[in-house]
């Protein structure tokens, strides 16, 4: 109960901000409708993290501070992509550079105290590529029929699993930040289903992928999140791309099938984190 009291205020505020922004975009800021999802996710997360952990300085002093700025970068990248509309190759290369820089920044302590330059840059390029693939998976999910709802249902499952796994791995703060993303995704999902607005919360893949990747990297390198759990959480969204239930005439049934399949690797990730968690000696 005490844990819920600590986590609910920031998650609730983030969800409320996301809902308000979606309403504002749909009613009065229609020029931003194509990146409404990015705005809702990014700004909602920033507000939630400020309430949970305070304002993040620049330059950040801790890895978790970077998550605040990753959300902002994700919003700016999504907005620039909508406004400029670059060619696909330029868009992909630009995003790969952004992801590589983001991974380099959040892994700076490992460069300072643990890794050689070669080992460090190998990790940076590998994780940067992983973030690019994650973003692409989320974008492809969103482009499918009923894709916006599917994107947020998948995000709910993945982020709620990450919340539990991170708490089990010894980081209540990271778990709380994952809970904020879960609340935002749940709000966007409900609004998409219950109130089918003319401007759905689209283009959320960039801030979602950057912040999620930052959470998993922080959990793995700076907490006790098992590598298997981090990898399963990162790969889970790709399961939603499988041709599951496509022969069904009910889009809601397809949504349920895909979400259920994504739940499997997420559940395994939580179980692995539970088995690896240190015993509680009280």
Language model: regions and residue ranges:
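Short, aromatic-rich membrane-interface segments at the entry and exit
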Residues: 32-37, 60-68, 88-94, 147-150, ...
